[in-house]
A protein has these predicted regions:
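Aromatic- and glycine-rich beta-strand/loop motifs that create alpha-glucan
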Residues: 1-21
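Long, hydrophobic alpha-helical segments
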Residues: 72-98, 102
Length: 309
C-alpha cells in the first residue's frame, strides 16, 4: 500500500516541494538584504539600549524600507493560503476515487476500506505536517529581523510562525477529506470545505484569540509634559453650554497643568511577549481538534456507508 499511495500522491508531493522551494528562494533574496540593512544600520545596538539618539530615525528608516514589503507580501495570502493548500491536498483523497470510479479496484482487494483510508490518512497527514512545519521554519527565518522590532504578536507574524500555520493547513485538509467523501467530487469539495474553514479561521482570530488570556494592564500617569501630552488628542468640538472643564482647553492653554490636576494618564492593555507560545498552543489545539473530529467522522462514515454505485 505504501508504493500505491506514493504513486497516487507523488504529483502533489512534487508540487508541494516546488511551492516550498519558491517560498525559500523568495525568503533568501528578501531576508538577506533585510539582515544586511539591520546590521549596517546599527539596530542590534539600538535594541540593546546602546545605540544613542540616532536609533528612532534608524528604526523608522528600516521599517519604512522593509516593513511594507514584509506586510504586503504576506497579508495578501494570510487568510487564504493555508486553507487553499489544505483543501487542494485533502479533497481528492477520497473524492477522486469516488468521482472516477477507481474505488472499485481499491476497495475490492483484501485490504478493507477502513484500513485503506487509515493508511492514506497516515501518510498524507504526515506529509501535510512536515510541509507546514517546513514553511513555518522558512518564514520564521525570513521575518527574524523584523520580528526583533515588531514582535511575534502582529497578525502577519503570528499566523505564519509557531504552531498555528501547520494547524490551519491540517484543519483545511481534514475538512476537505470529509467533504470529498460526502459529495464525491474533488473541485466542489475544495470549495465546500474552504468556506467553513475560512469562517472558523476568522471567528477564532477576531472573536476568540483576544480572549485566550486576560490582557495585562499598564497605567502611565502624567508626570511630565511628555507623558501627558503624548496621549492627548486635538480636534474640534461643537458649542458647549455651561461649565467647560479640564477636558477641553484652548490651543494655547496650559494642557499639561490641567492633565496633572485631573490625575489623568494613559491606560494600556497588552499581551506580554512571553505568552506567544501559550496563545499558539491554544489556537493550534482548536484547529487540531477540529481536524481530528473531521478525520474521525470520515473514517466512521466510510466504514458504515454502503458501497457507492
Amino acid at each position: 500500500m505504501l508504493w500505491v499511495n506514493w504513486r497516487q500522491h507523488r504529483g502533489q508531493a512534487i508540487a508541494c516541494l516546488g511551492l516550498l522551494a519558491a517560498i525559500a528562494i523568495y525568503a533568501i533574496v528578501v531576508s538577506t538584504s533585510m539582515r544586511t540593512a539591520f546590521s549596517n544600520d546599527g539596530l542590534p545596538a539600538c535594541l540593546a539600549g546602546s545605540g544613542g539618539t540616532r536609533c528612532p530615525t534608524a528604526i523608522q528608516a528600516f521599517t519604512n524600507e522593509f516593513g511594507s514589503e514584509v506586510n504586503v507580501a504576506f497579508w495578501s495570502v494570510l487568510l487564504i493560503f493555508p486553507g487553499l493548500l489544505g483543501v487542494v491536498i485533502g479533497a481528492p483523497l477520497i473524492g477522486r476515487e469516488l468521482e472516477f470510479g477507481t474505488w472499485r479496484l481499491a476497495w475490492s482487494q483484501s485490504v478493507t476500506r477502513t484500513r485503506w483510508l487509515a493508511v492514506k490518512l497516515a501518510l498524507v497527514t504526515g506529509g501535510v505536517i512536515v510541509l507546514g512545519a517546513a514553511i513555518t521554519a522558512v518564514i520564521t527565518w525570513y521575518r527574524a529581523p523584523m520580528d526583533r522590532l515588531t514582535g511575534h504578536f502582529i497578525n502577519n507574524a503570528y499566523d505564519f510562525e509557531g504552531l498555528v500555520l501547520t494547524a490551519y493547513i491540517l484543519c483545511a485538509f481534514a475538512f476537505a477529506v470529509l467533504v470529498g467523501l460526502l459529495i464525491r467530487r474533488s473541485i466542489p469539495a475544495m470549495i465546500a470545505a474552504f468556506v467553513p474553514w475560512l469562517a472558523i479561521r476568522l471567528v477564532v482570530e477576531y472573536v476568540f484569540r483576544p480572549h485566550f488570556l486576560a490582557p495585562l494592564v499598564f497605567v502611565q500617569r502624567c508626570s511630565s509634559p511628555q507623558t501627558c501630552m503624548g496621549g492627548a488628542g486635538l480636534g474640534f468640538i461643537p458649542p458647549v453650554t455651561g461649565h467647560i472643564g479640564d477636558w477641553v482647553l484652548g490651543m494655547g492653554g496650559p494642557g499639561t497643568v490641567a492633565l496633572l490636576r485631573g490625575h489623568l494618564g494613559n491606560t494600556w492593555l497588552y499581551q506580554p511577549a512571553d505568552r506567544f507560545w501559550t496563545f499558539q498552543s491554544i489556537e493550534a489545539g482548536i484547529f487540531v481538534a477540529l481536524a481530528a473530529i473531521a478525520l474521525g467522522a470520515a473514517i466512521w462514515l466510510l466504514h458504515r456507508r454502503p458501497r457507492p454505485a
